[in-house]
Every structure is written in structure tokens, then in C-alpha cells.
């Protein structure tokens, strides 16, 4: 919720252009991604605010919208996992464990999986300003630092320090 309000207040002209471009095509993928993130933030807002009857009803209504957009976009992002500034560029399967913690300004591409190794195992903690490329799997209780770029199709099972770039061929390599 806070993302939507802050973004609108700071970038009114950009929002007008975005709505004009994104909503002009009825099957625009950016439209549904934006609607999914909006519904996610409203569900988070109503879960975290006071527990009045109206808030519960509004949360259920937004939860229904979130599930609808989840079926359209194939995103499974639980509430209160991602920080502000979440960016998703394309449709595709994005699955995040409810116990994971993702910092601010994270960019996700399709095929990202953030999970755990065992049913009772821990999930990842991801810092701020992290880019996660298409097809990347983050498995287990790993810690990914701030300002990290992870290339496509990587499998991350070990901690990554701040200000790193990770690329994958046969084995994961940290470049910086």
C-alpha cells in the first residue's frame, strides 16, 4: 500500500503515462503485473492494520483479487515478504516461501524460486537492491547481501556477500 501511495504522489505524470500505455492494450502483461503488486500491497496493509470488521472485509476482497491475478500471472508471493519497490518485469512462475525475507528494491524475473530444502528448514534472507535473473533458484537459509546481481539460471545454496555479481555456468562464481 505504501509503495502505491508514495509512487503515485512522487510520480504523477509518470503514472498517467504508464496507465495510458499499459491499459490501452487490454492484454498488456504490465497491466496485470501492476494490478498483482497493487493487490498484494493492499492485502499487506489490511493484514497489518487494526482488526475492524470493515478492514477484514476489505482484506478478503483484496485477497480475492490477489488470487485472481495470481492465476493470471503465475506469481505466488505471500504478503509481508517483500520490501518496498518490488519490480517484476514479465509474467511467469515466481514462487516465494512465506518465511523468506526480501529487502527493498528487489527485481525478479520469471522462473525465480525462493524456497527451503526441508519442510522445517529456513528460507532465504535477501538484502536491498538485489537483481535476481530468470530461472534462478535460491534454496535454503542463505543470506544474500545488499546490491547483489544474480544472473539467470543460477542455483544459490550458499551465502553471497554485499556488492557481488553471481554468474553460473557449471558452478556458481562470485565475480566481485
Task: Tell me the role of every PLM-derived stretch.
Residues 1-73:
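Terminal amphipathic alpha-helical/low-complexity segments used for targeting or macromolecular assembly
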Residues 74-78:
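Conserved NTPase motor "head" modules and their coupling/switch loops across ABC/AAA+ ATPases, GTPases
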Residues 79, 84-85, 89-92, 97-98, ...:
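Left-handed beta-helix
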